[in-house]
């Protein structure tokens, strides 16, 4: 108690010193609080998907480097040949800006191309309507899934939004699903999203550009079966890679590398945050 009274007397006699001390404490406490919020959000908070520990990130790896992307034909082959996963989905490596027509003026929104059942793979069902099915994976498909924000802002949260039309890049699409509020695709920290992804369009796997194996532009995500291990799934994918290399010589230096989804998303920032917290 005596020390506290002495400290108050010192600060009363030296207001400038007191201001510096208070400012330093305020900055230190604020920085610590902010850093804890970042660490809690990145490292401690579970991924916003059902049973995220079963989710696996798959990316193409060559002898000399990792490409982090897979070609559409390879995705189709892996999806049809593997039995280690409940489901296997894919999405474009980055979203793209599209123009959506409105009554007032055209609006620019972010859209991502995704495969059938990607939302189901993540364990997040649309709040209304359905996920994409394989029949949607064609150039002629006009199905679209919209975000909760688009449903609210552009359709007023209408109960009958499923089946309504929306014009995207001068093409008329039919809304087949609405994602829950707060849903995000698992882009890793190498993709800096300046705007949320509000539209989800189906991959057109029969498009001529999607038939070229040397064009790698997909990210693959799988949900392991309950009885499967990551090691066994990796071994099975290695076997499929060798089978494909025997048919497609350009694939002879290529294979899939599997890592837990959480490790891929937060792995590269974990050491930096740990150092900052320690300091």
What are these regions (language model features)?
Residues 1-27, 268:
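N-terminal Sec/SRP start-transfer signal
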Residues 2, 6, 13, 41, ...:
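Generic recognition of well-ordered alpha-helical segments
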Residues 21-24, 170, 279:
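Residue-level recognition of transmembrane alpha-helices
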Residues 27-54, 61, 72-75:
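Alpha-helical transmembrane segments
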Residues 53-55, 84-87, 173:
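Loop/turn elements at helix/coil->beta-strand transitions in domains of secreted/extracellular proteins
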Residues 61, 65-87:
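Extracytoplasmic/periplasmic
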Residues 96-97, 110-133, 142-269:
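Mid-to-C-terminal secondary-structure elements
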Residues 265-279:
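N-terminal membrane-entry
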